[in-house]
Amino acid sequence: MKRMADFFSYALVFCILITFSLTSVVSFAAQDEINVVLNGTKLEFDVKPYIKNGRTMVPFRGIFEALGVEVSWDGVNRSVLATNDTTQIFIEIGKDYAFVNGYRIDLDAAPEIINGRTFVPLRFVSENAGADVSWDGHTRTVYINYIDEKH
């Protein structure tokens, strides 16, 4: 009888440990996620944003389209051209600089292609399109405030 009680005690402790371990893994994964909120609405990208050299990297087409910026991809030269009424942004993959209205701007994180998807630095793109950007490190959320003057 004592052996059976010991067995159930160990089984209970084991189940509790497994439960806490799984909860910690799920919690850690959720903390690792980066959220992007534009004018109070959470943006959903088809691939997840990530951090590179302290900069949040996002899929270029998703962020430009969310900001209402026209975008084109040049596959031969591996470059992105984005334009709105006042700004033209030219970015080349792998380069640590970009051009905004013809002026060279150094980047903290170079745009890159991962699994066939092009990622660009969110703050650089958003601010140069005319948005205000802030980061909440506690919730791992980027807040973008943007007024598209065309609408």
Regions found by a protein language model. Give the residues of each.
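Primary recognition of N-terminal secretory signal peptides and signal-anchoring hydrophobic helices
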Residues: 4-10, 16-151
